Amino acid sequence: MSQEISTENFAGQVVTDVAAAISGVLTNIGHKKGLYKAMAGVGDITAKRLAAITQCDERYVKEWLNNQAAGGYVHYNQISDTYYMPDTHIPVLADEESPFFLIPALEVAASLWLDEDKLLDIFQSGKGLEWGEHHHRLSCGSESLFRPGYKTFLINDWIKSVEGLSEKLESGAKVADVGCGHGVTTILLANEYPDTHVIGFDVHNESIATAQSRSKESGTNGNLEFKVASAKNYSETGFDLICFMDCLHDMGDPVGAAKHAKEALNPDGVVLLVEPAAGDDVSDNINPVGRLYYGVSTVVCTPCSKSQEVGAALGAQAGERRLSDVMKEAGFSSIERVAETPFNIILAARL
């Protein structure tokens, strides 16, 4: 149970939230104008020097730096009137390949403000809202947010955490990436395992078109396909691995999707389920990560599920117990947690 605080202290908490919300715009500016990258690893820097490097207006840069210092993103030296970014902040603010790079989350937030009228409507009506009905910045921001984590963990951690899976993929196998979106994980798998045939499925036509374009740019060797299909109606079978990457909780009928995966899987195959990190009870998730995920779940994940058949609305904080129950109801006999990160839990399900 939360401890009550004074009205004054609670007002201060809300001021902190409002300041963070407004500062998110400045963080996005810092990313898009190269301000963070220009500060990374250079030590103390003046507003004038930073403005010259980035070809931005000095007065705006000075005010931006003061905001960043007030938020603790950079440090300020009053004596020299200089600013610097600690090395420990670089992976979060300036390194786009780091799994801790979080700036794209602000692109997601920006998209949701643009969807405000739609969200007000569904809160009243109880209707759903498909991913494709959101502003396009949602898909782009989500891809940029998830990509570094997938590149860091998918091949070297999650796949290798499932006994025998890496060896099977290296020798040649068949893989489905269900709900593949723009194809980040699909392309990673195809490039890493050239003797394995990988198929990405997604119900969203525009996402599949983007994935196909990315596939051509990636230089895969012909072992990769993308197809428009839902999680319950792709016709291919004989898969050694079926992946659900941060998407099962978005589906209207997760049990139906898991049942279809069971039917499409080889007897010794495995389903790899990547889901947002969450405890099994609400009280386990009363923390900043839980707050973030409950927020996204309220305005993205739950509406997405409610827009589909069944509308189970698992939400982005379903937790391992509920996810395991889904897989068991679908007919899987073995479900185990094989890996985790600060933001994800990874389950492997077998027949």
Predicted features along the sequence, with ranges:
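Conserved Class I S-adenosyl-L-methionine-dependent methyltransferase catalytic core
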Residues: 13-21, 27-30, 37-38, 67-173
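Short amphipathic alpha-helical interaction segments
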Residues: 56-67
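Short glycine-centered segments of the SAM/dcSAM-binding site in methyltransferase folds
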Residues: 174, 269-270
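A short glycine-rich, Lys/Arg-flanked "PGG" loop and its adjoining helix->strand segment in the class I
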Residues: 255-267
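Core SAM-dependent methyltransferase catalytic element
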Residues: 330-351
